[in-house]
């Protein structure tokens, strides 16, 4: 009797241990910034353990890696990156970490846009900081491109975890359905606006893919610094363009300094109409805590500001 009970107990323990071991080994995934992290979570679900390097409301262009980031990469199975020179820190971080993880570039397959000036500016502490790059990296700002990101993530996860491939593909298909509905929603919101009232001003040139997909024109103070001698003339030139194009609103961005935009708003006689989310999500309690919420917030804020003029 005791032997029988012992065998049952032993089998139960071994079975439980095997199941626990199977469930205790999720795919270790590193995503470079918050938007990609959200895509990864949607596709991976509970089969992945996710580490996001650049968090909400943070600028990936100027991010300085920490020792913990190298440790995360060293233990990763998959690293998800935007590519197009968006993550300037990543090459040296990969080298420092010694990781042998698969690196998936999520813009592969996207029809990318060239940077007209060989790069674009960010505004940090009132100064214009140039980010060089041959192609505009902000491809996620058009929802059809986000679908490519999601497909690439599913492919990367399937390559690293064949047993979970069906789950990854099902998650991706379900999420792509949500993205299709979002794309339709944004197109309808912008289509309701008059053609001559579709221009806004933003802090940096991060919305060209949104512009091409949805028909809103974005102006930005490229290269203007609040501390430069040429700032007054540059701002005056931008204000002339704002008036010529009948721009109706100025938006701050969650990752950019607002001082220059406040100056432009005063001189152009336009309101600061709110905040758009360009290169990072908001925190969990903000209006852009995931990609769909971010795009819905941006499109809604733009449509409301332009309709009110």
UniProtKB/Swiss-Prot annotation:
Disruption phenotype: No effect on growth and no effect on zinc cellular level in zinc repleted media. In zinc limited media, growth is reduced in a znuA mutant background and also in an znuA and aztD mutant background. In zinc depleted media, zinc cellular levels are reduced in a znuA mutant background, an aztD mutant background and a znuA and aztD mutant background. Part of the ATP-binding cassette (ABC) transport system AztABCD involved in zinc import. Binds zinc with high affinity and specificity and delivers it to the membrane permease for translocation into the cytoplasm. Keywords: Disulfide bond, Ion transport, Metal-binding, Periplasm, Signal, Transport, Zinc, Zinc transport. Residues 117-132 are annotated as: D-loop. The lineage of its organism: Bacteria, Pseudomonadati, Pseudomonadota, Alphaproteobacteria, Rhodobacterales. Changing residue 120 to A: Impaired zinc acquisition from chaperone AztD. No defect in zinc binding from solution. Disulfide bonds join 158-165. Changing residue 121 to A: No defect in zinc binding from solution. No defect in zinc acquisition from chaperone AztD. Changing residue 122 to A: Impaired zinc acquisition from chaperone AztD. No defect in zinc binding from solution. Induction: Up-regulated upon zinc starvation. GO terms for cellular component: periplasmic space. Residues 1-24 form the signal peptide. The D-loop is required for the efficient acquisition of Zn(2+) from chaperone AztD. InterPro entries: AdhesinB, AztC-like, Bact_metal-bind_prot9, Lipoprotein_PsaA-like, ZnuA-like. Zn(2+) binds at residues 61, 138, 204, 279. The gene is aztC. This is High-affinity zinc uptake system protein AztC. Belongs to the bacterial solute-binding protein 9 family. One of its GO terms (molecular function) is zinc ion binding. GO terms for biological process: cell adhesion; zinc ion transport.
